[in-house]
Swiss-Prot record:
Belongs to the prokaryotic/mitochondrial release factor family. Signal peptide: none annotated. It comes from the Bacteria. This is Peptide chain release factor 1. The modification N5-methylglutamine is found at Q237. Pfam families: PCRF, RF-1. InterPro entries: PCRF, Pep_chain_release_fac_I, Pep_chain_release_fac_I_sf, Prokaryotic/Mito_RF, RF-1. It is found in: Cytoplasm. One of its GO terms (cellular component) is cytoplasm. Gene3D superfamilies: 3.30.160.20, 3.30.70.1660, 6.10.140.1950.
Amino acid sequence: MKATLRTRLDGFQERFEELAALLAEPDVIADQARFRDYSREYAELEPLIEAWRSYRRTEDDLEAAEQMREDSDPEMRELAEEEWREAQARLEALDADVKRLLVPRDPDDASNVFLEIRAGTGGDEAALFAGDLFRMYSRYAEKVGWRIEVINASHGEQGGYKELIARVRGDNVYARLKFESGAHRVQRVPATESQGRIHTSACTVAVMAEASAVGEVELNSNDLRVDTFRSSGAGGQHVNTTDSAIRITHLPSGLVVECQEERSQHKNRAKAMALLAARLKQSAVDAQRQQQADTRRSLVGSGDRSERIRTYNFPQGRITDHRINLTLYKLGDVMAGELGEVIDPLIHEYQAEQLSALQAS
């Protein structure tokens, strides 16, 4: 392990021990705000420090076994050789654990998200693919125990969606889905294609962390215009005789959100406000990432919806993620919800990228 990482880890251990002492002080215990903040920091550091301490102990075990390998007794040397191999294997595993835990956690990783899917180039075929993508995400959500609900949907004429917005709730949703933002391209033969020609169409996906607290995004009522209208279903027919659907316009930014999935105007308004807060938060994040993109590549992207990230080739059963040159011939499995096959390599690459930046700093 590099000396720079060791120095950083020793610093974290000193802070961890300092926090343990602070949490035992009566004046800190009496101050709920300080006690809560210190407890949170302590809990965040604890897994890293435990792994680092285990790493240091295993280094000592390895050194002891190394010395025993020089023993004059053949049986002792054989025993030492076995202990050395075991210690070496443990050290390699702990090295990976420490580095993984050292990567700074995105503060939004534990957040729920709003998932937007929009049909792009390709007309009806793009809308059908938007429906396929939503089913893929829904099946993945079911597999990992998340809950998904549609906030707003505009149906395609031949099926699928022109646009769909869903809220996804569960453990570490943003941590798993944040790499999905961008342009998703599909190559396949449409059902209406009599010549068997492959068509290319695309959808854009945006993943926005839900604002976790009311005060995280400031929404001034004077900056909002709220309109009501009747909900409509597929084909434009009205499905509700009351003006329960809500459209909110954020006047300073021009952002517009709608929600019409609930029969209650109150519920639609609450969901629309949550979506607006998430979009405003995402706008600020995108601006920050755009600045970062000028200096380094980021797998999360700059927030540009046109950034092509993935191709789904149905004739070949192939899915390719262009950011990490990942190609899998498991398209059927991925579309059936085995999205972890793509997400996990992206997370590993992102963590390696973050660790490299840490080592260079």
